[in-house]
Amino acid sequence: MAVKSLSNSILTPLQKKNRKQIQVWLYSILLLCLAIVLVGGATRLTGSGLSITEWKPIHGVIPPIGVEQWQEEFLKYQQIAQYKMLNRDMTLSAFKVIFWWEWAHRVLGRLVGLVALLGLIWFWAIKHIEKNVLLQLIIVPILIAFQGVVGWWMVASGIGQSNLTSVSQYRLAFHLITACFVIIFVTYLSQGLAEYSEKPASHRVQYFAGWLVVLILIEVYFGALVAGLHAGKVYNTWPLMDGQFIPDGLLQHDPIWLNLFENPLTVQFVHRFFAYILFFVAIIHAFYVQKNIPHSIHARRAFFICVMIAVQALLGIITLLQEVPISLGLIHQSVALAILCFSVAHWRATKGAYRAIE
């Protein structure tokens, strides 16, 4: 029998109630994901990411207890290149500080996975999930589990026999981008269950809003490469780099494409100038939406995205000039996540809510 679709405007009171409950659950997942990324940023900025050298998905929740267990954990850390090359004078007390950052990051990851899985089981059991969103909701805990595997794959690049004193910038960037995919997916899904007073925008506006999200994600990716290469610690001037608008040495690696991933100068250059491009595209998008849907909520959201990107650019400049202190680095990352979430919400709003299934 064919499934009949109903518009969002004629949702039954029960459907509205069920959707709001699922939204609350998805928002809790989203907040936990944002917290994980921010704690992960602090873990990276404090050099704590390699402090736990084993992956124990179940038993890893329990931290060391007593001096003997702490000494054992510290001894494991002393076997990796980061300790041998950078931290030979580290004390047990100092080790505990970096350990707790990484431990908190991992425990939050387990918590969000648990919230996603148990919530899915609960809402499915009480039949609150509409057929047209069931598959998307099943994907949420799968994406989170995959992200956990990627996290360990990233950490593995800096332990064992590795000569790296930090994780691979490639794996770090991939880890952040997969986290962003989870955030995008959960935001998009939750906003698809929202109620909207305005009508969906034209398909062209929808496509433009979607591509803006893609550009923001690309900028986040290059920001992750900047972090992985510690590229924010060099060329701490603006608007020029080393006294030049286009500095020498952008293409010093062979093959040329390698500069986009392993040359700190090139990576910072691309991150800077892609931000200018992103801001320009966001302005065009805002005026395009205003032209097509004058004085609409869609248009106001589009202009607010421009404001957020401008604020983020200013924060980026200040963070660079200050040589990336931990506080500014985390604020810069937080605003990036806020822009990503808001742009996804804007994109979903241009499409309207999911139609209900009768």
From Swiss-Prot:
Record field: transmembrane: 22-42, 107-127, 133-153, 172-192, 208-228, 269-289, 302-322, 324-344
Any single Pfam family the record assigns to this protein: COX15-CtaA
GO molecular-function term, one example from the UniProt record: oxidoreductase activity, acting on NAD(P)H, heme protein as acceptor
Record GO cellular component, one term: plasma membrane
Known catalytic reactions: Fe(II)-heme o + 2 A + H2O = Fe(II)-heme a + 2 AH2
GO biological processes: heme A biosynthetic process
Pathway: Porphyrin-containing compound metabolism; heme A biosynthesis; heme A from heme O: step 1/1
Cofactor(s) the protein needs: heme b
InterPro entries, sorted: COX15/CtaA_fam (IPR003780), HemeA_Synthase_type2 (IPR023754)
Localisation per UniProt entry: Cell membrane
Keywords, ordered alphabetically: Cell membrane, Heme biosynthesis, Iron, Membrane, Metal-binding, Oxidoreductase, Transmembrane, Transmembrane helix
Top-level taxonomic group: Bacteria
Membrane topology of the entry: Multi-pass membrane protein
Disulfide bonds listed in the record: none
Binding site residues for heme: 271, 332
Known EC number: 1.17.99.9
Major place of residence: membrane
Function in brief: Catalyzes the conversion of heme O to heme A by two successive hydroxylations of the methyl group at C8. The first hydroxylation forms heme I, the second hydroxylation results in an unstable dihydroxymethyl group, which spontaneously dehydrates, resulting in the formyl group of heme A.
Assembly and oligomerization: Interacts with CtaB.
Family classification: Belongs to the COX15/CtaA family. Type 2 subfamily.
Name of the protein this chain belongs to: Heme A synthase
Organism: Bartonella henselae (strain ATCC 49882 / DSM 28221 / CCUG 30454 / Houston 1) (Rochalimaea henselae)
Record gene name: ctaA
